[in-house]
């Protein structure tokens, strides 16, 4: 009856060891063997002996450390098989010609756009900046225009406190109220000049008739303070009352 020892199937039989040509005594322990004895005299094509393993040439994958034009494989290799690196670090094809910038992923073009700026974006930003610089006319609501017109019917000029109070009540700035009154006065003067063409001339005018001159009109146009300019307001109203009476007589005669 044969006795089967554990792990015996892992060791070659004596006949196999003898046929393989390895020559060492069977009674000598394996760890006490001379390394020269382990170098089996196998045929040149057998890759199992230590001498054959040590005498093998280095694989082609490790030859990248040497100069030349090695094929890049493994870590950091190119996705294109057969791609090589030259001495200057540029990528070469199989034929030895370097890749163009476009074949390397187009990074050069992106870098140029990043450094030089995108002309489309720069033109758009310039257009936006120019549109912001354009002066836009202020728009007023119907309520604001109605209040301004009613105030203009009462007085053609506003003093500083009145202008500030009106601007605050309408939610406007003082400059907007001031400009609106300036434009409205200009329109009112033009309209008054067109509607009163039959005014008596200087030759037909009575000596006591008072027609407001340009200086008087300028005096009337100046802002008045109701608290300190009472006498000035009284004189201006008297002059303009006489002028209005002359205008009313001229209209009745027509």
From Swiss-Prot:
GO terms for biological process: cell differentiation; regulation of transcription by RNA polymerase II. Residues 120-129 have a biased composition (Polar residues). The keyword DNA-binding applies. It is found in: Nucleus. Residues 133-192 bind DNA. It holds the Pfam family Homeodomain. Residues 112-140, 191-228 are annotated as: Disordered. It comes from the Eukaryota. Keywords: DNA-binding, Homeobox, Nucleus, Transcription, Transcription regulation. Signal peptide: none annotated. One of its GO terms (molecular function) is DNA-binding transcription factor activity, RNA polymerase II-specific. GO terms for cellular component: nucleus. Putative transcription factor, which may be involved in patterning of central nervous system and pancreas. This is Homeobox protein Nkx-6.3. It comes from Xenopus laevis (African clawed frog).
């Amino acid at each position: 009856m044969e006795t089967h020892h554990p792990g015996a199937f892992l060791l070659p039989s004596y006949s196999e060891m003898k046929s393989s040509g390895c020559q060492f005594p069977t009674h000598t322990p394996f760890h006490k063997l001379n390394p020269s004895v382990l170098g089996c005299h196998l045929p040149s094509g057998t890759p199992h002996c230590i001498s054959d393993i040590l005498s093998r040439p280095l694989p082609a994958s490790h030859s990248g450390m040497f100069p030349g034009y090695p094929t890049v494989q493994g870590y950091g290799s190119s996705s294109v098989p057969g791609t090589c690196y030259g001495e200057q670090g540029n990528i070469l094809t199989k034929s030895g010609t370097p890749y163009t910038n476009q074949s390397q992923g187009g990074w050069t073009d992106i870098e140029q756009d990043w450094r030089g700026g995108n002309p489309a974006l720069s033109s758009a930003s310039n257009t936006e900046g120019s549109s912001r610089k354009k002066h836009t006319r202020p728009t007023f609501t119907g309520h604001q225009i109605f209040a301004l017109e009613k105030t203009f019917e009462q007085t053609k000029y506003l003093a500083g406190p009145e202008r500030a109070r009106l601007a605050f009540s309408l939610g406007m700035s003082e400059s907007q109220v001031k400009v609106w009154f300036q434009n409205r006065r200009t329109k009112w003067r033009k309209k008054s000049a067109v509607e009163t063409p039959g005014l008596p001339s200087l030759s037909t005018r009575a000596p006591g008739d008072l027609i407001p001159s340009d200086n008087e009109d300028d005096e009337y146009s100046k802002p008045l303070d109701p608290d300190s300019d009472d006498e000035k307001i009284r004189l201006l109203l008297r002059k303009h009352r006489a002028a209005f009476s002359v205008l009313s007589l001229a209209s009745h005669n027509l």
